[in-house]
Amino acid sequence: MSDVDMESGSDDSGMEDLDEEIQKIKQKMIDDSQSVVLANQLLILLRKNGDFDELDIKRRQFVEWAPLNPLNWKNWIEDFQNRKPEPSVAEVEEMFEKALFDENDVTIWVERAMYAYKVANDKNKKEDFKFCRDVCSKALENLGTRYDSGGHIWLIFLEYEMSYLKNSMNAPDYQRLADQVFALFERALHCPTDQLEDVYVLAEQFCTEFKQHHKLEELKKTYNSTMRQKEQLSKFEELIQQEETKKQGLKQFFDHEKKSGIPSRIKMAHERLVSELDDDEEAWIAYGAWADIELKLPQVAVKVYSRALRHCPYSFVLHQQALLAFERDRRPNEEIDALWERARSNVINSAEEGRSLYRTYAFLLRRRIHLTGSSDYSPMAEVFDEGAALLREWFSMAWDTTADYRQMQAYFYASLMKNMDKCRNIWNDILASGFGRFAGKWIEAVRLERQFGDKENARKYLNKALNSVSDNINEIYMYYVQFEREEGTLAELDLVLEKVNSQVAHRAIRPQKKVSEKPAPAPKSKQDHIQKRTSGGEPIVKKVKGDDGGFKAPLPPSNAKSSSAVSSSNASSTPAPGSFAVQKAAPGTEDARTIFVSNLDFTTTEDEIRQAIEGVASIRFARKANSDLVHRGFAYVVMENDQKAQQALLKDRVPVKGRPMFISANDPEKRVGFKFSTTLEKSKVFVRNVHFQATDDELKALFSKFGTVTSVRRVTHKDGKPKGIAFVDFDTEASAQKCVASGDKLMLRERELEVALSNPPVKKDKSHGKPAAIGASLEEDGPRKGHAAKLQLVPRAITNKTPQITARLDAMDVSEGTSTSQPLSNDQFRKMFMKN
């Protein structure tokens, strides 16, 4: 916010210019009457022009709705002090309190401290030096540890204390006063402020002037320690001082202070943010949330939110949080209600904001009524009804797009108001406004009826649901049948089963959608596809699902370039159908010494990979979009030479940040298989029930009594967490046989281990599994969702009878009837079709 130059001109032309500027600002304020910037500029110009009568009126008007800037507050306080008759100290202090509520600014605190010192030395005033000391202590509490402002407060306070001590040298308690000043210097030198050096110079002066040389060394140690902290903070200050990097510097400074965990420093960091960015809604929200959740001081949170609403009166989030903060601090109901009136009238700009505010205040009233012991919830009902009517008027059909507000309102009327008629009216409105096709909404209405209403109305809702629901109709079927089991008679249960079975059959015979008989478009060649993708510039890198369902990594930049070069040079040749030639990396090239690493933590750094693998030349991470801090969990690592690349491959599954890092050669055409044997290995034992925190060394030491252990491998998940199993390799088969046949209890970390020869089962290949029989259903849930029946793959001539839902008296469960005929096999189907 830029202030108008305060220096007044002496000639008439200057006065005329000011009059013209004042008129321009007044004209602008006609169109933008709530502009804080224009209001502050107008006050400065009016004072500079000498229009004190109008200035006084405008000040009182603007301060009601807008925060004045520090310059306008200092001008107002100065004019207030100079008025006749002279105002009392209490009146001036009240002005300072109002100013500091708007702007917690160091210049205002300095003015207040200077005024307090002046009053303390005025013999006509009753205030003594204790008054000045109290004011300075308040200033330290509000700004003492703030990097850019605390030093000013410390210097002025220490100078006042030294002056008072100098005048008390003959006092009997002189030594006590000197010790107090020394303690103040210690506190000041513990605060890393931008004027720390000046504070230390003043400390040296104090020790020399008041003969405290023996304490200087102690102060110097404190100073040196704090200087190291200041050097860290000064790096952020360089960014803050430059306009283009100001926000970035403030964010980094705040994050640094937050890591310290010291509440006073975190508070000062928040103060710095809201001081520099006073109209930033997010900064105020974070400050209030910290005071509420971390600091847990309701009185501090209330003050923060009250200040925030002065600077951001348009924020519905701040009003919402302020209502709850006022409630936690047990503020008078009148204050809370006044805040609610301002919020309701000024900050609702969308249906979501309106629902959130009305919901917050409605349940605030519920808690208030509960605390008083009353059972009259009519004030809460008025708020719910007002919110529904007002939001419906403002936002039409979009006022409650998810029906959450009306569901809360209906539950309130049923549970607290005991008014089921009103509750049913609200639910009828919900179901009639587009939610009648969802099974969940009907079931919620039925549950409310069962809890607070009667069974007959619940049954009416379920009957209507049978003909209305198109989303997940089976859920309604099952719920209705279960409802009659629990609430109805046998006749009512039979009636429902008949209705449900009738609907199931009706849905099953509905005509199916005709499949389009248009011929499928001819597949495009991969070469055409590649040319189309690359014609607009750089080739597009897509995520492709591999054969195993995992993520197939894109080619590194070097391979992408070589692939395009090969395709252009071999354009005349015709590749085989379905093939795509990839040039093999020549020995000695960069591609030949590039390896592919994956399964990395998204925050793994280059240094951590270099520590795990020796001989790394460069690393290229696959970054996530719009993020330089995290990557996709894999990278291409270029080694110094081919030998280093081969050595790196031997370190496959080396742990990095607690996860096994997968290392493979950079060959997109080669699929990396399982590198361990899946057959019987007589020299290796399989160990089960291994403690998750057991180490390889512990396992090796335990099994060494049976023979020489060559290796130990604990099996882990991809995220590095152990599975609780391991494989132990012996140098001979006899050692492994001895281990299995010993019969000894093998205990490790209070767990008994189970051992057997390593013979893992063959992993089933899902892609080559035996096809299911023709006509075998993949689902057993009846008709699919929606009005259309499920697509049937069984010839009509041999279709079984329509499944019927029956009530078995022995199990009392809903099940599908089974056909007595035997299902046909694939061979029978094949013979039947071959006859034609």
UniProtKB/Swiss-Prot annotation:
Residues 593-668, 683-760 form the RRM domain. PROSITE patterns: RRM. It comes from the Eukaryota. One of its GO terms (biological process) is mRNA processing. Keywords: mRNA processing, mRNA splicing, Nucleus, Repeat, RNA-binding. The keyword Repeat applies. HAT repeats lie at residues 127-163, 296-329, 331-367, 418-451, 453-486. It is found in: Nucleus, Nucleoplasm. InterPro entries: HAT, LSM_interact, Nucleotide-bd_a/b_plait_sf, RBD_domain_sf, RRM_dom, Suf, TPR-like_helical_dom_sf. Its main location: nucleus. U6 snRNP-binding protein that functions as a recycling factor of the splicing machinery. Promotes the initial reassembly of U4 and U6 snRNPs following their ejection from the spliceosome during its maturation. This is Spliceosome associated factor 3, U4/U6 recycling protein. The gene is sart-3.
